[in-house]
Amino acid sequence: MLSKDIIKLLNEQVNKEMNSSNLYMSMSSWCYTHSLDGAGLFLFDHAAEEYEHAKKLIIFLNENNVPVQLTSISAPEHKFEGLTQIFQKAYEHEQHISESINNIVDHAIKSKDHATFNFLQWYVAEQHEEEVLFKDILDKIELIGNENHGLYLADQYVKGIAKSRKS
């Protein structure tokens, strides 16, 4: 049986994942409207991935006979200065989500909730992967440059990542 604290934290995480999906959808839209189709595709796909993270949490809660408590999702940021800023914000956002997951893991350990601890190991690994991915993209954008030809090359680099993650 899940403790009240774990239930509260997992419900909050569902909403954080839904917010993440909306944020990446907003970033994707900005990219597409600025002819950055590669980054737009990557972020669009990533929005769907975040939605799947929320679904996985919902299923876990439901399997434990816990009703999910969805809250309102605030409007995501939609004005950005450029591709570097988008990926910097995305990287920082992933770090925030990692902290949140780690906090739930800490609570599961303290309450000796082995099932939740085991379930969350997938999220721990996933967050590590996402932080590495976004940091790598950010580093490449900064290396290539965010101006003219560099911006095009950076967009094509991100497009390549999006396509490789689908296969």
Curated annotation (Swiss-Prot):
Fe cation 2 binds at residues 50, 94, 127. The gene is ftnA. One of its GO terms (biological process) is intracellular iron ion homeostasis. The keyword Iron applies. GO terms for cellular component: cytosol. InterPro entries: Ferritin, Ferritin-like, Ferritin-like_diiron, Ferritin-like_SF, Ferritin_DPS_dom, Ferritin_prok. This is Bacterial non-heme ferritin. Residues 1-145 form the Ferritin-like diiron domain. The keyword Iron applies. Pfam families: Ferritin. Homooligomer of 24 subunits that assemble into a spherical protein shell (12 +/- 1 nM diameter) that can sequester at least 2000 iron atoms. Iron-storage protein. Its main location: cytoplasm. It catalyses: 4 Fe(2+) + O2 + 6 H2O = 4 iron(III) oxide-hydroxide + 12 H(+). It comes from the Bacteria. It is found in: Cytoplasm. Its EC number is 1.16.3.2. Belongs to the ferritin family. Prokaryotic subfamily.
